[in-house]
Swiss-Prot record:
Mg(2+) 1 binds at E232, E268, D296, D339. It catalyses: alpha-D-xylose = alpha-D-xylulofuranose. It is found in: Cytoplasm. Gene3D superfamilies: Divalent-metal-dependent TIM barrel enzymes. One of its GO terms (cellular component) is cytoplasm. This is Xylose isomerase.
Length: 444
């Protein structure tokens, strides 16, 4: 079998003093924390599309990336080479999961029947490679946004034929995700939204989206797919407005259509910031709803208004993200998928490794800091004290539903002073900084 990365050694943990760009500084996959190796807390995954398909094209320029698998001109040879490259890449980095869209892994034929046959051949190759490897499928998905047929949407299109095409495509994607043992299946509605309301039947589009998701739930039951269904919110791009705007919007939609019990969320950092939220906000919202499923690990650039999908290197953000994951009880059928691409000018194969190492180290460090914060109950203690008034007296009655407007008026009407606690934001922020510094100082 062809080797795609002969110059890259197996990436080792060398510790915080290491200056080797091809080594982990903070991430030791086998380090046991809370009875579990770090690799099982973090469940890193490679995104097939960014790492093996994307070639560094942007709206202004041609591909820049050096990718040895693209030397093959035959589309099938290229597809198989990408699969082989994925397995070699994951093994060298000690990454146990990957994610893909149907159209990332195999070229399209003239009809859907032909496309499905081609897809089956590549799925066979993946299954073959899985046999003697630890690499597993985190989640699969269908690309319902690249082909021109999806210009008006997929489940929310104006064309019943396109709706049928999308349904058949998801049906097949569910089958192959099941066949490959995928832990989850993602719905990201890249074209499920609108450009202008002047030409949009908003009511019908939303109803059709619900019909589509229900059919997916029913088909998954029928074939015995037990993976977790995940909605990935994003407010805009490529459409001006996307229906799964953020966690709160998507949750209300699911509730409204009686679909909430079947779905959790796949939260992407860059999508959170595009929605005007922090990554932490989206994760917290999903957590309190009991719906934190998986994460697309990346970061955006706050000065740019689009989805830059950069490798996550911001310790503060990964700390707050892992804090939410820990408080949610950790990942079950989910993980940290690097939906991230190296910059167009980082065009060497080596940069793919460096990007993933940077992301893995940053999340490992974030996890360690967050673990201490959670264990010491730093924020919990503060929050509990801040809301103490709801634990006794009138507050307790409010919480237990034992009071009403009249009783509350009677209680408060002659009271002269109300005593309030301080929010102490600055104190908590500097405490967080101390935990970051303390954790780093204790690292090997
Ligand atoms: C695009 C999305 C997409 C989903 C999967 O912005 O992040 O890649 O994760 O379809
Ligand atoms: Ca994503
Ligand atoms: Ca993205």
């Amino acid at each position: 079998m062809m080797e795609f990365f002969p110059e890259i050694p197996k990436i080792q943990f060398e510790g915080k003093e290491s200056t080797n760009p091809l080594a982990f500084k903070f991430y030791d996959p086998n380090e046991v924390i809370d009875g579990k190796p770090l690799k099982d807390h973090l469940k890193f995954s490679v995104a097939f599309w960014h790492t093996f398909v994307n070639e560094g094209r942007d709206p202004f320029g041609d591909p820049t990336a050096e990718r040895p698998w693209n030397r093959f001109s035959d589309p099938m040879d290229k597809a198989f080479a990408r699969v082989d490259a994925l397995f070699e890449f994951c093994e060298k980095l000690n990454i146990e999961y990957f994610c893909f869209h149907d159209r990332d892994i195999a070229p399209e034929g003239k009809t859907l029947r032909e496309t499905n046959k081609i897809l089956d051949k590549v799925v066979e190759r993946i299954k073959e490679r899985m046999k003697d490897s630890n690499v597993k499928l985190l989640w699969g998905t269908a690309n319902l946004f690249s082909h021109p047929r999806y210009m008006h949407g997929a489940a929310t299109t104006c064309s019943a034929d396109v709706f049928a095409y999308a349904a058949a495509q998801v049906k097949k994607a569910l089958e192959i995700t099941k066949e490959l043992g995928g832990e989850g299946y993602v719905f990201w509605g890249g074209r499920e939204g609108y450009e202008t309301l002047l030409n949009t039947d908003l009511g019908l589009e939303l109803e059709n989206l619900a019909r589509f998701l229900r059919m997916a739930v029913e088909y998954a039951k029928k074939i015995g797919f037990t993976g977790q269904f995940l909605i990935e919110p994003k407010p805009k791009e490529p459409t001006k407005h996307q229906y799964d705007f953020d966690v709160a919007t998507a949750y209300a939609f699911l509730k409204n259509h009686g679909l909430d019990e079947y779905f959790k969320f796949n939260i992407e950092a860059n999508h959170a910031t595009l929605a005007g939220h922090t990554f932490q906000h989206e994760l917290r919202m999903a957590r309190i709803l009991g719906k934190l499923g998986s994460i697309d690990a990346n970061q955006g650039d706050l000065l740019l208004g689009w989805d830059t999908d950069q490798f996550p290197t911001n310790i503060y953000d990964t700390t707050l993200a892992m804090y939410e994951v820990i408080k949610a009880g950790g990942f079950t059928k989910g993980g940290l998928n690097f939906d991230a691409k190296v910059r167009r000018a980082s065009y060497k194969v080596e940069d793919l490794f460096i990007g993933h190492i940077a992301g893995m180290d940053t999340f490992a460090l974030g996890f360690k800091i967050a673990y201490k914060l959670a264990k010491d109950g730093v924020f919990d203690k503060f929050i509990e004290e801040k809301y103490r008034s709801f634990k006794e007296g009138i507050g307790k009655e409010i919480v237990e539903g034992k009071t009403d407007f009249e009783k509350l008026e009677e209680y408060i009407i002659d009271k002269e002073d109300i005593e309030l606690p301080s929010g102490k934001q600055e104190y908590l922020e500097s405490l967080l900084n101390s935990y970051i510094v303390k954790t780093i100082a204790e690292l090997r």
